[in-house]
UniProtKB/Swiss-Prot annotation:
This is Uncharacterized membrane protein YkoX. Belongs to the DedA family. It is found in: Cell membrane. The chain crosses the membrane at residues 30-50, 62-82, 144-164, 179-199. PANTHER family: ALKALINE PHOSPHATASE LIKE PROTEIN, UNDECAPRENYL PHOSPHATE TRANSPORTER A.
Amino acid sequence: MIHKHETRELVAIEELVMSWIEAFKSLSYFGIFLALSIEFIPAEVVLPLAGYWVSKGDMTLAGVVLAGSLGGVAGPLTLYWIGRYGGRPFLERFGKYLFIKPEALDKSDNFFKKHGGFVAFSGRFLPGIRTLISIPCGIAKMNVWVFSLYTFIAMLPITFVYVYLGVKLGENWKAVGSILDQYMLPIGIAILALFLLYLLMKKRKKRTHSEQLSVFLKNKR
């Protein structure tokens, strides 16, 4: 249950965020980029509002989508670098108290080197995870260019949909977040399920190949 004082605090926070976003508007597309670069400013608010500005002719759809997508990479990159230069040393020193062994860190590194791009991509579609996923990518020292590319590829359609709906709903742009939230999680889960299926099939194919090679070598003797 949300008490009245908590409601007032939430309203105050929302008003503060909105005032910042309105201030960013004066910077045009660079303002959109900056707003998306700051992780605690929700993209679910910025992008539909920017779509509303597009509907009024203040900006263009293409410009907002590009600026928003680039900003959507800059923000995660900050967390990536925090994970890269602060996360691994911390876990190597204190991981034993969290029951995290060095071998587990090495396995994580290998996994992200092989599949980090897909993890960075699919994580953008999962509410609650999309912000945090950048940190383990950094801890595993995933290639920064690969991380940035996959994050950008994911942000392009996400940004477009939020902005486009903001354009269509106009003054009712605030409804965009609640409309899309119900779809983002199923999409993210579906993408992860396909990825796990791919890994399973790849592992099975590798095992079958090993068995065939073993039989071939055995018959050669």
